[in-house]
Regions:
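Hydrophobic (often cysteine-bearing) scaffold residues that line and stabilize catalytic clefts
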Residues: 19, 111-112
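Short helix-capping/linker segments at secondary-structure and domain boundaries
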Residues: 18, 55-59, 123-127
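Glycine-rich, phosphate-binding/catalytic loops in enzymes
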Residues: 20-22, 144-145
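Metal-dependent nucleic-acid phosphoesterase active-site entry motif
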Residues: 1-20
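PIN-domain endoribonuclease scaffold, especially VapC-family toxins
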Residues: 2, 24-38, 42-108, 117, ...
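Short, locally clustered residues in the helix-turn-helix/winged-helix DNA-binding domain
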Residues: 13-14, 52, 120
């Protein structure tokens, strides 16, 4: 199993993003190799937040995808059909708390620690993400979407 980070989901949905094809290629490669891409509820919450924020950079935009709630909901349905959604387990909170205390995690990085805690609760050690730097301090294997080569390259 490999967890898909929220940024992979977001880029898969945004054809205008230069990394859209990279994200889709990585996920298709995982599926073709019978690897099991999985998602956790936090990824859906974060996707909804980004997807339904106003597109564009501040001050006019909010760094979002500019989707309507119906569009974001359709994508969530697609993700649920395509990937395995692993529910949060009871041990998530104590695992998260241990990580943030032991590694000295503060601020917004505590959300990254929660993803890692969810991974640990399922014995998952690989994360597909465009934000490798956010996860370097955690005891996981970071997989870059760009590591999946395009056919013919």
């Amino acid at each position: 199993m490999i967890l898909l980070d929220t940024n992979v989901l977001g880029r898969m949905t945004d054809a205008a993003d230069p990394q859209c094809a990279v994200a889709r290629r990585a996920v298709h490669s995982l599926l073709a190799s019978h690897d099991r891409p999985v998602v956790v509820p936090q990824g859906f919450y974060e996707f909804w937040t980004v997807a339904t924020r106003k597109a564009g950079s501040p001050p006019g935009g909010q760094n979002g995808l500019g989707m309507t709630p119906d569009q974001a909901s359709q994508w969530l349905g697609f993700f649920q059909r395509r990937f395995t959604l692993l529910p949060d387990r009871e041990e998530l909170l104590p695992r998260w708390h241990d990580l943030v205390r032991r590694l000295g995690i503060t601020g917004i990085r505590s959300y990254d620690a929660r993803l890692v805690a969810a991974m640990q609760s399922y014995g998952i050690d690989r994360l597909l993400t465009f934000n490798a730097e956010h996860f370097r301090r955690f005891p996981i294997t970071i997989v870059a979407p760009a590591s999946f080569e395009a056919v013919g390259e």
